[in-house]
Swiss-Prot record:
Record's keyword terms, sorted: Aromatic hydrocarbons catabolism, FAD, Flavoprotein, NAD, Oxidoreductase
Protein name: 3-(3-hydroxy-phenyl)propionate/3-hydroxycinnamic acid hydroxylase
One Pfam family, short name: FAD_binding_3
Family note: Belongs to the PheA/TfdB FAD monooxygenase family.
Pathway listed: Aromatic compound metabolism; 3-phenylpropanoate degradation
Reaction(s) catalysed (UniProt annotation): 3-(3-hydroxyphenyl)propanoate + NADH + O2 + H(+) = 3-(2,3-dihydroxyphenyl)propanoate + NAD(+) + H2O; (2E)-3-(3-hydroxyphenyl)prop-2-enoate + NADH + O2 + H(+) = (2E)-3-(2,3-dihydroxyphenyl)prop-2-enoate + NAD(+) + H2O
């Protein structure tokens, strides 16, 4: 047998799957859970033998927790978090400069949460056991990937049997092999400043919050994680080598700046790192995609590297599932880059800017900075702007898988994330809205029946796509049965948050994507025309696909953690 015929025979024996994910980090694991829930055959390829067992990311935001809720794992994640974590900034004399303590939880979860990444990653991995059609291959490195007209063929080191898939997603980190195979640039900068990070067990300070010391002598950070773990970070001066910084005596000297007995601490791990501000030239090329650190890197100062990767998975996951399942055309996948690039760029820029504010080592520059920050804090609106983290860029899609009837307006809700208050149904009380909406598309109307607004044909078309239909009412009307419809769930506005939202917007009908972005919004009379337009911009098919998404799929019940303090979730009574 010639090499060519041997290769052909091997190709015939190839393993078939729908999506190959390269990398079993948090982004790849989250994406695999999203695809698994939608019945998509998925294979994760990871060159390591097991999960990374040391902390990397230390902060989860409300959007990430909402995604973990969507995949049915938030109750597994919450025990490894510190909710409502306050972040304080101090000057070189340990006087308070600013504080971040956002009070609201409009998306259903606290905005700032410390967490232990290895334990959360382990829960994401364990969640895959629910899906017989999802496989993880540990200790396998992707050697090459060949794209064909209808898919990709992946070859793994040490495995003669190739893997055929329709799509491949590189979630393989900043040194992404997928990105290199795609021939995509990774433009940006790497800071010349180095930092020493030290993770400590049995927290020597013990308080629940975090702080950043904008000390020109040596900027530092002290971050409470969970389970008694604390992270310290110290800037390394230009005249200090990496070898010096990793010496135990140097580490003890740094820790001695913040703890009384540095020799007694239990070091989990320490390393020297630099900050990168980079973004890939393309997030999609043919049938290959990039997500997480493979697509973008940002400084740590806003804790958004991990969370940005989870946003990638949430954005791309439902689109891949819809295309693989036949509910949408391949063009829907082009909207991933269109939507995620601008927001990732904004997060990179914000994180880079905050790092520049924190890091000056010139005392005069630091003194001017301190005066400006203190002056701004005297103004109530500016103080709230920082305290409530209003500076954080929120996704607002002007293009992509969204419909704007005219030029996007700053006040239009289309392209933004919808809130997640607590609501009542006829059968349950005090449930988070997403539990009612399910895991697919949803049509939500205030005080109207979606079927009456859409008409029979459009209603049935959304139903064939697995959409759920929800009529929101004031709580006083919850048990009125005059307009009942077996396909429409009636919810009572338990907290008034829904009425408040609709009061602030002209639109009363919302078409929600599976990632809870508002794909389209309109007044009641325009529901049919906006619905029709959405089938076009979402590239949805007429037939409703292959049926994996079934409308009767049970909604995953996510109970509120018993340890969650009152007031951390929007609408908690």
């Amino acid at each position: 047998m010639t090499p060519a015929t041997a290769r052909d025979a091997t190709e015939r024996d190839a393993t078939d799957t729908d999506v190959v994910i390269v990398g079993a980090g948090p982004v790849g694991l989250t994406l695999a859970n999203i695809l698994g829930l939608q019945g998509v055959r998925t294979m994760i390829v990871e060159e390591r033998a097991t999960l990374i067992d040391y902390p990397r990311g230390v902060g989860l935001d409300d959007e990430a927790l909402r995604t973990f809720q969507a995949i049915g794992l938030v109750d597994k994640v919450l025990p490894h978090t510190v909710p409502n974590q306050i972040l304080r900034f101090f000057d070189g004399n340990r006087r308070l400069l600013a504080e971040m303590a956002p009070p609201d939880a409009r998306f259903g979860w606290p905005k700032r949460n410390g967490f232990v990444q290895p334990m959360v990653d382990a829960e994401l991995h364990a969640g895959l056991a629910r899906f017989p059609h999802v496989e993880v291959r540990w200790g396998h490195r992707m050697a090459e990937c060949e794209e064909t007209a209808d898919g990709v063929t992946v070859r793994l080191d040490g495995d003669p049997t190739p893997v055929r898939a329709r799509y491949l997603v590189g979630c393989d980190g900043g040194r992404s092999a997928t990105r290199r195979l795609m021939g995509v640039s990774f433009d940006g900068t790497t800071s010349p400043t180095r930092w020493l990070v030290v993770d400590i067990a049995n927290d020597p300070l013990g308080h629940p919050n975090s702080e950043v010391g904008a000390d020109p002598a040596r900027p530092y950070a002290s971050i409470s994680i969970a389970h008694g773990i604390r992270r310290f970070e110290f800037m390394i001066h230009a005249d200090e080598t990496d070898e010096q910084a990793e010496d135990p005596a140097f580490i003890h000297r740094m820790l001695g700046l913040l703890v009384p007995h540095p020799e007694r601490v239990e070091v989990i791990r320490h390393r020297v790192y630099t900050h990168h501000s980079r973004i890939a030239g393309a997030f999609r090329k043919g049938r290959m995609f990039l997500a997480g650190d493979a697509a973008h890197l940002m400084p740590v100062w806003q804790g958004q590297g991990y969370n940005s990767g989870i946003r990638d998975a949430a954005n791309l996951g439902w689109k891949l599932a819809a295309v693989v399942d036949g509910r949408a055309g391949d063009a829907l996948l082009d909207t991933y880059d269109v939507e995620r690039r601008k927001h990732a760029r904004a997060m990179i820029d914000l994180s880079t800017m905050v790092g520049r504010v924190i890091s000056p080592t010139n005392r005069r520059v630091a003194a001017v900075r301190d005066k400006l920050i203190r002056g701004a804090s005297v103004v109530p609106t500016l103080k709230r702007y920082v305290l409530e983290m209003r500076f954080k860029p929120m996704p607002r899609y002007e293009q992509g898988a969204v419909f704007h009837p005219e030029a996007p307006s700053p006040t239009s809700p289309a392209g933004t994330l919808f809130i997640q208050p607590r609501v009542d149904t006829r059968d349950a009380q005090n449930v988070l809205l997403d539990e009612v909406l399910g895991t697919g598309f949803a049509v939500l109307c205030w005080n109207n029946n979606p079927r009456a607004l859409l008409g029979a044909d459009l209603f049935d078309r959304w139903k064939a796509l697995g959409a759920r239909f929800v009529a929101a009412r004031p709580l006083t009307q919850l048990h009125w049965t005059g307009h009942d419809d077996p396909d429409v769930t009636v919810i009572g506005d338990r907290t008034g948050a829904l009425k408040g939202w609709f009061d602030a917007h002209a639109e009363s009908v919302l078409f929600l994507r599976p990632d809870r972005c508002i794909a389209g919004a309109c007044i009641a009379q325009r529901a049919p025309e906006v619905s029709t337009a959405l089938f076009g911009v979402l590239h949805l098919t007429q037939g409703g696909g292959n049926g994996h998404h079934g409308a009767d799929r049970p909604v995953l019940h996510v109970a509120q953690s018993a340890t969650e303090p009152s007031g951390t979730v929007a609408g908690t009574p």
